[in-house]
Amino acid sequence: MSKLIPAIKVNNLSFYYDTQKILEGVSMEIYQSKVTAIIGPSGCGKSTFLKCLNRMNELESEVRVEGRVEFFNQNIYERRVNLNRLRRQVSMVHPKPNLFPMSVYDNVAYGVKIVGWRPKLEIDDIVESALKDADLWDEIKHKIHKSALDLSGGQQQRLCIARALAVKPKVLLMDEPCFGLDPIASMKVESLIQSLRLRSELTMVIVSHNLPQISRISDFTAFFKGNESRIGQLVEFGLTKKIFNSPHDSRTREYVLSRLG
């Protein structure tokens, strides 16, 4: 294996909603150009952890973070950090497609236009490239100026991925990207993730309950579980093959066996 370079370093991270502690003492590294999966039972703080990686949790009120999250050696929780820039570099795809009520083209171009003025032909190229990167161009190139809301659920989710890719992030966070999709649509999203994994230097972090899928698409896996007080903690982190086949912790083993049968 080539030398692993951390894109994100998490050190002793704890997270609170008001006075309620959701995460406690999480430390791990997310490696550049690798796919890291976050697994664990419902309610153990997986999605909360994901949103800590680009400060999306701060869109809600009364939150508090302790510890450090470093993105290429810069603490993202320093006051001087530009949040818009951070969230372009560490972009996020949510469980359900959150498209704007506008055309396919405008959905993809939206983030590009916010960054600054560019000639229309350049934006056209960016939109086409992002849709191709999301394995969507051939399916919808004849209707990119029609409403994005008319697409199927699977196409809408891949369009959200295209929109994220259009701003050239270094890290892509995906929270249950196949949530609610039928098996065929889910497989297309999985194939897209595999394709991005093989042909790009994009770092991806994926939260999922679908362990068979995670075993196929991820390089590393982190297992989270709530303690006796239902506070989410990192139980074990390592190569996906190791976590799935010979984990160190009995709690990891029990969870993996219960999900895989």
UniProtKB/Swiss-Prot annotation:
Keywords: ATP-binding, Cell inner membrane, Cell membrane, Membrane, Nucleotide-binding, Phosphate transport, Translocase, Transport. It catalyses: phosphate(out) + ATP + H2O = ADP + 2 phosphate(in) + H(+). It comes from Trichormus variabilis (strain ATCC 29413 / PCC 7937). Its EC number is 7.3.2.1. The complex is composed of two ATP-binding proteins (PstB), two transmembrane proteins (PstC and PstA) and a solute-binding protein (PstS). Coiled coil: none annotated. Part of the ABC transporter complex PstSACB involved in phosphate import. Responsible for energy coupling to the transport system. Belongs to the ABC transporter superfamily. Phosphate importer (TC 3.A.1.7) family. One of its GO terms (cellular component) is plasma membrane. One of its GO terms (biological process) is phosphate ion transmembrane transport. The keyword Transport applies. PROSITE patterns: ABC_TRANSPORTER_1, ABC_TRANSPORTER_2, PSTB. It is a peripheral membrane protein. ATP binds at G40, P41, S42, G43, C44, G45, K46, S47. SMART domains: AAA. The gene is pstB4. It is found in: Cell inner membrane. SUPFAM superfamilies: P-loop containing nucleoside triphosphate hydrolases. PANTHER family: ABC TRANSPORTER I FAMILY MEMBER 17, PHOSPHATE IMPORT ATP-BINDING PROTEIN PSTB 3. This is Phosphate import ATP-binding protein PstB 4.
